[in-house]
Amino acid sequence: MDNVRGSIMLQPLPEIAESIDDAICHELSMWPDDAKDLLLIVEAISRGDLKLVLVACAKAVSENNLLMARWCMGELRGMVSISGEPIQRLGAYMLEGLVARLAASGSSIYKSLQSREPESYEFLSYVYVLHEVCPYFKFGYMSANGAIAEAMKDEERIHIIDFQIGQGSQWIALIQAFAARPGGAPNIRITGVGDGSVLVTVKKRLEKLAKKFDVPFRFNAVSRPSCEVEVENLDVRDGEALGVNFAYMLHHLPDESVSMENHRDRLLRMVKSLSPKVVTLVEQECNTNTSPFLPRFLETLSYYTAMFESIDVMLPRNHKERINIEQHCMARDVVNIIACEGAERIERHELLGKWKSRFSMAGFEPYPLSSIISATIRALLRDYSNGYAIEERDGALYLGWMDRILVSSCAWK
């Protein structure tokens, strides 16, 4: 996609006018603002400029201009498609978010989103396919595992706490790596926080793997939301080297802007009190936590455009699961970011700079990722599109698509 055109399209409507013929702009300057906006939108529709119409609709919603918003929504319905170009697919879900925002608020929106969730096993199957075709999960898991393996290289008793264990896929490679350690594998305990029904499957899966590779292993299941986890749930024991993993989960915790309880910082302080040897953080490099609605919409449009374009390269449009993957792994996030506010908006991403501030305030110090980890991940990316790139900066790793950073990874102690 043309970068110059893309940057113009992400500007507010009065600034977009600068890209139009000078004569038209002069004429528009004599018109009321609503008339100017309307003409710009009509021109955007006629040339199929979906991004501009999306931004115009979001601007109308933010200004509570119901007539303009509903007219834009009607036009957008004829421009978006869940089986079209990346921007058409993303546009379909962003439109859904705008409609939901205009129609309702708070818990009613969140409940309507929840009602469309697939069963846990079904959702995890979609995540698995995404894991295989795009490097986002592998990047995060490999960088975190590398930091944990390095920190634990001389330890004989290891306890890893994963605050969002999912399928437990991250730990397969690490268990195998520990099994290959000269002199024998260490004793490993993994505490997994997650959905109770899934934890049973994860426990059996990891126990079977550990037995196959002759690794002493135990699994501790914590079936409760991460924000409700207390020290006594984690079964931390003396004599065990502790590692803690926060992979794609801290952004789900409400911070001080949502609740006085501030679970985001509370959890970090609690983990610091356990004296872990290493703590790993993997997060989407996106700024949607405290931003007002319109800037948040623009950031979401920019970020997920890159995400959908990268998936389009790796997963054919006729792939039978692609729509399900996009709908359940990303679209729900997009709709939540756009439609919801307050406690009902659970997708609250922050940039790594803000995460660094939070970790520092909780008493952590950086644990720089080694060059070996970045070299390993660079080798991994050879299996994917050359549109992906790795950047190593200030002890952290960044994964990007074209000129947009999508994921960051770092470690702390």
From Swiss-Prot:
<comment type="subunit">
    <text>Interacts with Meloidogyne incognita 16D10.</text>
</comment>
<feature type="region of interest" description="Leucine repeat I (LRI)">
    <location>
        <begin position="48"/>
        <end position="108"/>
    </location>
</feature>
<comment type="function">
    <text>Probable transcription factor involved in plant development.</text>
</comment>
<dbReference type="GO" id="GO:0005634">
    <property type="term" value="C:nucleus"/>
</dbReference>
<dbReference type="Pfam" id="PF03514">
    <property type="entry name" value="GRAS"/>
</dbReference>
<keyword id="KW-0804">Transcription</keyword>
<dbReference type="GO" id="GO:0006355">
    <property type="term" value="P:regulation of DNA-templated transcription"/>
</dbReference>
<feature type="region of interest" description="SAW">
    <location>
        <begin position="339"/>
        <end position="413"/>
    </location>
</feature>
<dbReference type="GO" id="GO:0003700">
    <property type="term" value="F:DNA-binding transcription factor activity"/>
</dbReference>
<feature type="region of interest" description="PFYRE">
    <location>
        <begin position="242"/>
        <end position="336"/>
    </location>
</feature>
<protein>
    <recommendedName>
        <fullName>Scarecrow-like protein 21</fullName>
    </recommendedName>
</protein>
<comment type="similarity">
    <text>Belongs to the GRAS family.</text>
</comment>
<feature type="short sequence motif" description="VHIID">
    <location>
        <begin position="158"/>
        <end position="162"/>
    </location>
</feature>
<keyword id="KW-0805">Transcription regulation</keyword>
<feature type="region of interest" description="Leucine repeat II (LRII)">
    <location>
        <begin position="201"/>
        <end position="233"/>
    </location>
</feature>
<feature type="region of interest" description="VHIID">
    <location>
        <begin position="127"/>
        <end position="192"/>
    </location>
</feature>
<feature type="domain" description="GRAS">
    <location>
        <begin position="41"/>
        <end position="413"/>
    </location>
</feature>
<dbReference type="InterPro" id="IPR005202">
    <property type="entry name" value="TF_GRAS"/>
</dbReference>
<keyword id="KW-0539">Nucleus</keyword>
